[in-house]
Amino acid sequence: SKYQSMPLQYICHMNYAFIPEARMSQSLPDGAFQLRRSVPNHVAPTRQWLRINEDILAGKIDADSLVGAEAFDPEIVYVADDLPQYGKTAEFRMQARAHHNFVTRFRTDQFPVATRWILHNADQRVAAYVLPGTSRPEGRLAAEAAGTLIHLDAGATRTFSVTTGLLAQGEAFD
């Protein structure tokens, strides 16, 4: 806005295709990704979905694997908060097949939150192995309560940078 401050939330949406049995890894410590506990209004929990959530919380389902994730409908969402505590940059990978990896890297001061969003049904097969964000995808009020809502001064701008792509087996990512 040219005349008043405005709130800002930004999530870089990259919905990579769901590849059965893919493995994900990240520069974060084990356990940094946690299952989202809130249930958004657009999600209608089924018995199977509730059981999947219980299995995730019990450690029976690996947050870094798509093995068995064909049952993730509605979506299963993981979040990692306060990424700057883990370093200046964060890197995430999804090994799609023996021949290549998807990779995403970003600065944690720009994106202090990461979301992993997985959905598999007849219409959508998505493995968003990382969605860099300024806040969780739970809306403005939740971001404000968490202290992650950005307020831009009138006329101010903000720039974000994400590097993502596909690497062949053995190819370096610099």
Name what the model sees in each region.
Residues S1, C12-M14, R158-T164:
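A structural signal for short, well-ordered beta-strand segments
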Residues K2-Q4, A17-F18, A32-Q34, R136-E138, ...:
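Flexible loop/turn segments at secondary-structure boundaries
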Residues K2-S27, A172:
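Acidic (Asp/Glu-rich), glycine- and aromatic
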Residues Y3-S5, A69-D73, D82-P84, F106-Q110, ...:
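A short linear-motif detector with a strong N-terminal bias
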Residues P7-I11, G87, T157-T159:
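A general secondary-structure signal for short beta-strands and their flanking turns/coil
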Residues A17-V103:
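Active-site/ligand-binding surface loops and adjacent short beta/alpha elements
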Residues A90-D174:
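Active-site pocket scaffolds in enzymes
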